[in-house]
């Protein structure tokens, strides 16, 4: 160490020098600032020794593994002994407000870090633990203080601006000479931003007597006046107008330093350098400020004594600090001007000292913002790099960044590869870029005229283009909108990492605009392929003054391959996905639009097409080049191992320095090489010998060849130094033999034939019988065993034998699925060959069930066959599942025919083969006569391509099976029987599967057992089938509440009618053939998986193949069932159960249509089953009846017990004094609804249960009911006893009491429902004890007894089937409110519980989504669990007291005080996060329940309704009361609360009474119409009769006009929403062809309807997904009513004897109402004409209003929406004739569904 350095070292403030150097680590931490500023430093590498754990320095002998794990540090080398060397590294202590070192200038080059300490002296601002609690109030109520600051500044500026004209001015930093007015004119937006910046400092002023930083001021002196903070808080409370007189006086005194108030202002100004956290949206801070990494506000920390202190993690940036001072100056000037006589205190010469000091501070900060960073670069030879501003930048930094971007590119490519057969980068490079058959010889630089072929893409021969993109050019039109969007988004995302790869690969850096404008085609083209090296070369000429000559930069081979792949493959995919209608790009100055006669007439679509085919780096979503903000995000995270990240400017200077000092060694001797490197970095070369020894130099100074050579050599040096090609096996020498890389030679001399690829052949793994056993153990566990020997032998036959075609008939429930499931799993386990199999089922309803069963345990990869048809084989899926329509489709046939070619081109191997073709329930090919025309396409299928065909059925005797197979083009069954163990192939096998007879295995005949003997089959003739079916279902659910049932109806209309009428009794799912495929699958899956669903109603399609647990009953109402349909339906009862065949008396006989099987006959069902299967008849013999005709001998014990219980229940009902059916109809309906309440799931009940606070059991009594009421007492037992009476309802009501047991005892009576309702009490047990009576739905208390359906009082127990409330227990089925329990199926509100099947009742219309995506933060369960500060706990308690019902399912209307019946019609369903505009209550990284920092979260454990959710609903209430303009202004007014939902709720609650009154006043007419159903008559509207012909029409004319409008829309395929929005008749065929809601929404999104709606209407005031989500499940109740009206419409039409008219389906109907809602012109017209209605501003209210009925001119009733359409049509046309309208009535079969 030098003597001078030693002296500096001795002077350093390093007290623990000796003890630190005695440490065994080579690296020693040193906090000395002076030391590192005085002594030269170096960069050394260190590693952690695994054995000792010590930090060691990397030496020459350090091992390779330790070198890889090493890290670098800037250190000072110190010799502490003989050959003992230590290294000091600077460790900066985080400066806190209690003290701490000043940061080192060496480590913090930006002067702001010194300025906040030297100029603002923030280190002297000391905060203690009490201060932190006080500061917590600011963060807890930041929205309030933002609003307060804004209002105060706005009021002060308003008063100051109203002063008489004052000519006084002051000089400003930007206008120093003439000066500017002291009170400047400010816009409201500027005042609002200033207010956000002032909020923390306004808080400091209001708490000046509490914070320790003002301790010097707080010491009172005689005669001084203190700031009255309480008065300030009262005066500055946000109200209109704000009292600012006292505040103005305080500001004047602070400026004049009166009573030491200047000290307060002095401290507040110094505190401006502190970062109190970013403000809300629209606040201070620009993009540069927000981009600072690791920025944190003042946050709490714990010192060694356990005390909370505040630490400054990041000071304000110069730009943000300047804006804060701007706000402070504006506030001081405005506030002082309010009361001051003159403004001399702000004079530049004679002003007060405080103002001069503020000006000095401001000018220092302003000048700091204008200074550019100075880049101090030093050479670090040890690491082969440099140091830029103290940050190490070397080759490893560049390589780490580069390969991280490459990995990101590959990951995004992998996402595309999951959807497409993507060629790899190496494939494209080998096939085209390195292939010498492809020539890339062309002149460089762009041409003056735009040409289509001005791209190296056009130089690629067609034959290679076809091979490169075999999948992308096929079936493009069949790609869904979601898939297209996924493609475009993925390619947009991988564009950015590719830009970074190019940036590093060229070495000599680009400025960003130069990199941004890289183009592979067009007049600005600068991307070429060098024909010699096959690398990408870039010719760019960007310069700020436009005088730069073109620069040539060459990419390395690896980057060249990626760029070439991006242009040839990915960009073409992107163009196909965007489609011809893409028009996001506008004409910008950076693009050259040539080739058009009149550039002004060029459309956005033309411009977008040019850009896509020209420029590389695009953001197609925004319609622009990749923005710098997007590009630079990678710098914040990459490279991962770098301790300090460089920004883009530092990186640019670093790359230039690397090129100077590290890349080349000949610079000192070769001046031309050195100068070329500077020019390639766009640096000007200084003239003079002092730099390069030449007078002047430019690339024009040498010949063209020499200039090119110099630039190529510069790029070559960079490529070699960086080493990107070191592991890349595509060197320049190998490019000359690119033919070796291309797989295979041409199959013939024909030049146009496709290039064949080398295929890898592997030996086949042998099959073993053990494979089937292993597959079974994978699927069912280690204890797996086959059902019987037949099942084992069949599995081996399918898996092992060479028989190409097998047919199996087995009884329902036998396990036919496992016969092919196990062989498929065994095939998938083989590693030599990938088998792809296909399964087809007859109906869509089976699709979901099959996929669920086959994909369980993850043994098989299962996907819909639609994926294969549209996108081809993905190489991952083992089994594709589809329906018969898919099997018969031409596209599927074509895919199979081209299988070998597809596999060769895509997978480059022949080891991907077709496996099994499996057809389930194949008898339908013969028996489904009406569908046989649809099966014609199956005959074209190449069956020979499959390894084996398997046909399965439970109802296919030989005759049916043979005919079915022949109908699809196969030979049929083998004529003579074959032994099941015979594995030899016959001679006909050589002709292929289609020519080989199918081998039949008939397990029913082999076992000689009649199927369905385990089911009790009952044939009943009744007066009314629906009534009898309802009785049976109610009885079943009374006995087995968790069971399920299937009801088979004869027509689609009957299905819907039964569903509508039974929905009030139990949860129903209905299905028939007119539903869309997706809807069928969804409903089937819902019924199978949802345990709360009770009944599945459908036509015969629900009887085949569905496997349903807990199914106990099947009811047949169809009098046309044939024997196959009967067997399939009864076969759903896998484990036994009851099957009822209900027929009307004297109406069973039915004729069968031609070709169909005859219906079943009246008589013994078992004999008919035997006859069908060809079994021996036992008519008149013993054993004839098996499970039928009253025989129970073959039934299981559970089935027999179920029959007996059903019989007992029927007897009790028959002997009761008054049965339910004997009651009057209205009485019966009411009681039935109550009786079955616990199975009821209608939308009305769900709404009431949650939002109306209504109990499932009401307290009303009827007909001799007895009530026992107890008030303000403790009742151990409260009883109501009734003898010999009929109690429809017996209630025990208790108020403010604790009831241990509340009983209602009834003797010799019929209790339809017995309940106990309590208010503000705890009911441990509510029960009803009954003696010799019939209880339809009661709960009985029993002691030491066994009752399958009773309820006992249980504590800490488990009830299998109870109907009572238990505490700390598990209830399988409960119907009351439970606490701290787990309810498997409940219809009530639960607290701190888990509801496994209460989706409809626990969360309704938005709450479910809210709870799923935005759960309330549970403080006790979070990882940051801590003891909250007193301020936070106090705030939490206050909020809990202010909003006490958030533990329940509360809504804001309840909070306002509305009654439940009012809430039902004003209910705010559909209000979720998307209702709020972007930026309102949608901040991320904070608590999802209150939007506060996690340390300050005010949510409480058990809170069900978050404050954030209540804020959404409160915002919706405000929307109810405001029109569009007022609501937009309101959003601006509450902008301080956009990030503070809790503060907004407080603000909202202040106006609680006012809002309630306003809603009652504004919506009185709405409630009168919707709640009291007051009639609207068009004749009562004077303006309507005078101003519209529609109001003089009859109801029939209005209906006819409505049908005509829809007929025209349907014929022209017009987009509905757009038409009703602005009468724009835009075509959208996809909308009318959509089969389900999802496809419908995709069609609307594809044509840009939602985007236009947001841009044109008030829909932009909601979130981007709000309107789109209206088509989901928000309007289920309204949808059910509408679909029910469709059936009523059809019934009315048929009753009148007219042809039914087509009416819109639900999605089109909803589109119409949404379009009308946002049509401002129409709304104004309608509200003017129809005087009984007024404005509604929420979409749910509009939808409800549209469905009320109005009286037309002839006093006939029509829905209001029909009147709306008529008015809309009138506005579109000149006039509407008064006479009869011509309508188009489309005939329809009465049995079909009305609608689309």
Curated annotation (Swiss-Prot):
GO terms for cellular component: cytoplasm; nucleus. Residues 1031-1180 form the Helicase C-terminal domain. Keywords: ATP-binding, Helicase, Hydrolase, Isomerase, Nucleotide-binding, Repeat. ATP binds at residues 810-817. The keyword Nucleotide-binding applies. SMART domains: DEXDc, HELICc. One of its GO terms (biological process) is telomere maintenance via recombination. Residues 1294-1397 have a biased composition (Low complexity). It is an enzyme of class 5 (isomerase). Coiled coil: none annotated. Induction: Induced in absence of telomerase TLC1. Belongs to the helicase family. Yeast subtelomeric Y' repeat subfamily. Catalyzes DNA unwinding and is involved in telomerase-independent telomere maintenance. This is Y' element ATP-dependent helicase protein 1 copy 1. It comes from Saccharomyces cerevisiae (strain ATCC 204508 / S288c). The lineage of its organism: Eukaryota, Fungi, Dikarya, Ascomycota, Saccharomycotina.
């Amino acid at each position: 160490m030098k003597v001078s350095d030693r002296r500096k070292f001795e002077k350093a403030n390093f007290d623990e020098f000796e003890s630190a150097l005695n440490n065994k680590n080579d690296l020693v931490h040193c906090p000395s600032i002076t030391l590192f500023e005085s002594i030269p430093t170096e960069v050394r590498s260190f590693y952690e020794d695994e054995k000792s754990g010590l930090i060691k320095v990397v030496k020459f002998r350090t091992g390779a593994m330790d070198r890889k794990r090493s890290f670098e540090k800037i250190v000072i080398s110190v010799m502490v002994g003989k050959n003992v060397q230590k290294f000091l590294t600077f460790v900066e202590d985080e400066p806190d407000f209690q003290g701490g070192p000043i940061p080192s200038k060496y480590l913090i080059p930006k002067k702001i870090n010194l300025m906040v300490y030297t100029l603002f002296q923030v280190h002297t601002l000391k905060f203690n633990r009490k201060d932190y609690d006080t500061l917590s109030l600011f963060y807890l109520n930041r929205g309030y203080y933002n609003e307060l600051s804004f209002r105060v500044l706005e009021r002060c500026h308003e008063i100051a601006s109203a002063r008489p004209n004052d000519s006084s001015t002051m000089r400003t930093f930007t206008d120093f000479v003439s000066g500017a007015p002291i009170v400047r004119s400010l816009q409201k937006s500027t005042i609002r931003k200033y207010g956000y910046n002032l909020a923390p400092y306004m808080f400091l002023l209001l708490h000046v007597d509490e914070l320790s930083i003002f301790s010097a001021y707080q010491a009172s002196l005689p005669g001084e006046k203190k700031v009255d903070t309480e008065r300030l808080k009262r005066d500055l409370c946000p109200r209109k107008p704000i009292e600012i007189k006292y505040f103005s006086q305080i500001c004047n005194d602070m400026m004049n330093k009166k009573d030491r108030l200047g000290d307060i202002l002095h401290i507040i100004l110094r505190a401006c350098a502190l970062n109190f956290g970013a403000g809300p949206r629209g606040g201070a801070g620009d993009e540069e400020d927000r981009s600072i990494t690791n920025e944190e506000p003042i946050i709490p920390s714990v010192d060694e004594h356990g005390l909370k202190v505040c630490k400054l993690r990041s000071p304000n940036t110069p730009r943000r600090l300047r804006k804060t001072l701007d706000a402070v100056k504006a506030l001081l000037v405005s506030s002082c001007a309010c009361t001051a006589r003159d403004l001399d205190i702000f004079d530049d010469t004679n002003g007060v000292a405080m103002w001069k000091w503020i000006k000095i501070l401001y000018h220092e900060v302003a000048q700091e913002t204008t200074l550019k960073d100075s880049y101090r670069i030093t050479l670090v030879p040890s690491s082969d790099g440099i140091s830029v501003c103290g940050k190490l930048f070397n080759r490893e930094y560049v390589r780490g960044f580069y390969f991280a971007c490459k990995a990101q590119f590959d990951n995004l490519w992998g996402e595309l590869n999951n959807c497409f057969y993507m060629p790899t980068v190496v494939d494209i490079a080998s096939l085209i870029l390195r292939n010498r058959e492809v020539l890339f010889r062309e002149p460089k630089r762009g041409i003056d005229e735009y040409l289509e072929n001005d791209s190296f893409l056009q130089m690629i021969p067609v034959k290679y283009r076809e091979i490169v993109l075999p999948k992308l050019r096929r079936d493009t039109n069949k790609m869904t909108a979601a898939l297209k969007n996924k493609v475009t988004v993925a390619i947009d995302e991988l564009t950015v990492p590719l830009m970074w790869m190019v940036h590093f690969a060229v070495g000599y850096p680009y400025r960003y605009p130069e990199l941004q404008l890289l183009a592979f085609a067009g007049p600005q083209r600068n991307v070429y392929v060098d024909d010699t090296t096959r690398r990408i070369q870039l010719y760019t000429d960007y310069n700020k003054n436009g005088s730069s000559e073109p620069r040539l930069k060459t990419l390395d081979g690896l980057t060249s391959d990626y760029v070439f792949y991006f242009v040839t493959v990915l960009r073409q995919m992107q163009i196909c996905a965007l489609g011809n209608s893409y028009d996001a790009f506008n004409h910008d100055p950076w693009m050259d639009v040539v080739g058009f006669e009149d550039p002004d007439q060029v459309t956005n679509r033309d411009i977008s097409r040019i850009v896509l085919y020209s420029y590389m780096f695009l953001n197609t979503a925004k319609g622009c080049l990749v923005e710098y903000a997007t590009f630079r995000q990678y710098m914040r995270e990459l490279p991962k191992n770098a301790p300090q990240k460089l920004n883009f400017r530092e990186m640019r200077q670093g790359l230039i320095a690397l090129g100077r000092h590290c890349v080349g060694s000949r610079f000192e001797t070769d001046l031309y090489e050195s100068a070329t490197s500077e020019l390639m970095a766009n640096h000007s070369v200084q003239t003079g010998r002092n730099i390069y020894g030449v007078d002047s130099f430019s690339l024009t100074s040498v010949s063209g060849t020499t200039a090119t050579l110099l630039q190529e050599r510069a790029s070559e040096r960079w490529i070699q130094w960086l080493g990107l090609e070191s592991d890349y096996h595509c060197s320049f020498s190998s490019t000359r033999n690119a033919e070796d890389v291309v797989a295979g030679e041409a199959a013939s001399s024909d030049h146009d034939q496709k290039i064949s690829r080398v295929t890898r052949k592997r030996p086949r793994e042998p099959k073993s019988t053990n494979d089937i056993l292993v597959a079974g153990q994978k699927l069912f566990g280690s204890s797996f065993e086959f059902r019987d020997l037949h099942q084992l032998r069949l599995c081996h036959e399918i898996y092992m034998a060479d028989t190409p075609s097998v047919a199996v008939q087995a009884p329902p429930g036998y396990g036919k699925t496992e016969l092919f499931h196990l062989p498929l799993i065994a095939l998938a386990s083989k590693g030599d060959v990938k088998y792809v199999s296909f399964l087809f089922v007859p109906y869509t309803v089976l699709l979901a069930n099959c996929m669920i069963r086959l994909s369980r345990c993850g043994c098989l990869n299962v996907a819909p066959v639609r994926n294969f048809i549209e996108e081809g084989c993905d190489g991952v899926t083992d089994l594709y599942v589809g329906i018969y329509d898919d099997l018969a489709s031409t596209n599927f046939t074509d895919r199979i025919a081209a299988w070998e070619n597809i596999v060769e081109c895509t997978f480059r191997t022949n080891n991907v083969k077709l496996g099994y073709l499996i057809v389930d329930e194949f008898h339908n090919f013969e028996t489904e006569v009406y569908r046989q025309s649809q099966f014609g396409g199956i005959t074209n299928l190449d069956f020979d391509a499959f390894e084996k065909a398997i046909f399965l059925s439970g109802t296919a005797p030989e005759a049916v099976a043979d005919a079915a197979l022949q109908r699809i083009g196969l030979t049929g069954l083998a004529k003579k029987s074959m032994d099941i163990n015979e594995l030899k192939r016959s001679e006909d096998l050589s002709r292929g599967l289609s020519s080989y007879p199918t081998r039949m295995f008939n397990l029913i005949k082999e076992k000689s057992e009649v199927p369905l003997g385990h089911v009790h089959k009952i044939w009943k003739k009744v007066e009314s089938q629906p009534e009898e079916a309802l009785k049976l279902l109610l009885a079943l659910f009374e006995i087995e509440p968790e069971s399920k049932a299937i009801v088979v109806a004869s027509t689609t209309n009957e299905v819907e009618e039964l569903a509508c009428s039974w929905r009030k009794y139990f949860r129903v799912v209905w299905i028939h053939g007119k539903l869309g495929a997706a809807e069928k699958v969804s409903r089937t899956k819902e019924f199978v998986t949802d345990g709360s669903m009770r009944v599945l109603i459908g036509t015969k399609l629900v009887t085949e193949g569905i496997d349903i647990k807990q199914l106990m009953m099947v009811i047949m109402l169809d009098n046309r069932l044939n024997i196959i349909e009967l067997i399939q339906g009864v076969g759903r009862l896998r484990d036994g159960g009851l099957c009822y065949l209900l027929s009307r008396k004297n109406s069973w006989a039915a004729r069968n249509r031609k070709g169909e099987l005859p219906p079943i006959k009246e008589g013994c069902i078992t004999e008919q089953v035997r006859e069908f299967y060809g079994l021996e008849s036992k008519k008149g013999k013993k054993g004839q009846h098996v499970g039928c005709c009253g025989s129970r001998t073959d039934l299981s014990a559970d089935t027999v017990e179920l029959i007996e219980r059903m019989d007992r229940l029927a007897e009790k009902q028959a002997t009761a004094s008054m049965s339910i059916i004997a009651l009057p109809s209205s009485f019966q309906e009411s009681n039935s609804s109550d009786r079955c309440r616990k199975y009821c799931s209608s939308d009305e009940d769900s709404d009431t249960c949650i939002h109306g606070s209504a109990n499932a059991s009401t307290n009303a009594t009827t007909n001799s009911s007895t009530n026992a009421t107890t008030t303000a007492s403790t009742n151990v037992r409260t009883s109501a006893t009734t003898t010999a009476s009929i109690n429809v309802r017996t209630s025990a009501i208790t108020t403010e009491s604790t009831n241990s047991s509340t009983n209602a005892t009834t003797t010799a009576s019929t209790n339809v429902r017995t309940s106990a309702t309590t208010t503000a009490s705890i009911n441990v047990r509510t029960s009803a004890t009954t003696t010799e009576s019939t209880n339809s739905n009661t709960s009985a208390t029993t002691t030491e007894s066994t009752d399958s359906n009773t309820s006992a009082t249980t504590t800490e127990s488990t009830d299998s089937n109870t109907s009572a409330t238990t505490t700390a227990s598990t209830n399988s089925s409960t119907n009351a409110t439970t606490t701290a329990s787990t309810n498997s199926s409940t219809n009530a509100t639960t607290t701190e519980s888990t509801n496994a099947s209460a989706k409809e009742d626990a969360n309704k219309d938005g709450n479910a989504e809210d709870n799923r995506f935005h759960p309330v933060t549970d403080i006790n369960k979070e990882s940051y669990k801590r003891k909250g500060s007193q301020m936070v706990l106090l705030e939490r308690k206050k909020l809990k007291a202010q909003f006490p019902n958030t533990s329940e399912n509360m809504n804001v209307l309840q909070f306002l005080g509305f009654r439940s019946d009012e809430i039902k019609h004003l209910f705010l369903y559909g209000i979720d996060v998307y209702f709020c505009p972007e930026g309102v209550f949608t901040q991320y990284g904070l608590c999802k329940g209150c939007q506060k920092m996690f340390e300050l979260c005010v949510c409480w454990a058990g809170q069900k309704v978050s404050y954030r959710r209540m804020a959404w609903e409160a915002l919706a209430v405000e929307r109810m009361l405001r029109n569009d303009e007022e609501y937009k202004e309101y959003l601006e007014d509450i902008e301080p609360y956009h990030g503070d939902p809790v503060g907004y709720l407080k603000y909202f609650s202040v106006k609680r009474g006012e809002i309630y009154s306003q809603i009652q006043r504004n919506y009185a007419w709405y409630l009168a119409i919707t709640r009291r159903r007051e009639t609207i008559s068009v004749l009562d509207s004077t303006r309507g009769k005078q101003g519209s012909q529609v109001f003089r029409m009859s109801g029939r004319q209005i209906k006819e006009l409505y049908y005509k409008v829809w007929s025209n829309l349907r014929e022209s395929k017009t987009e509905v929403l757009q038409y009703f929005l602005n009468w724009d008749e835009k075509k959208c065929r996809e909308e009318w062809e959509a089969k389900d809601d999802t496809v419908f929404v995709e069609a609307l999104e594809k044509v840009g309807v939602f985007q236009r709606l947001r841009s044109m209407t008030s829909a932009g005031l909601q979130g981007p997904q709000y309107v789109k989500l209206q088509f989901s499940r928000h309007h289920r109740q309204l949808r059910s009513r509408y679909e029910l009206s469709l059936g009523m419409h059809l019934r009315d039409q048929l009753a009148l004897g007219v042809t039914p008219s087509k009416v819109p389906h639900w999605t089109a109907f909803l589109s119409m109402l949404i379009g009308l809602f946002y049509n401002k012109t129409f709304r104004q017209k309608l509200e003017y004409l129809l005087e009984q209605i007024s404005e509604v501003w929420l979409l749910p209210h509009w939808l409800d209003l549209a469905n009320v009925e109005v009286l037309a001119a002839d006093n006939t009733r029509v829905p209001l929406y029909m009147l709306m359409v008529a008015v809309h049509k009138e506005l579109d046309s000149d006039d509407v004739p008064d006479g009869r309208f011509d309508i188009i009535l489309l005939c329809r079969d009465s049995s079909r569904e009305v609608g689309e």
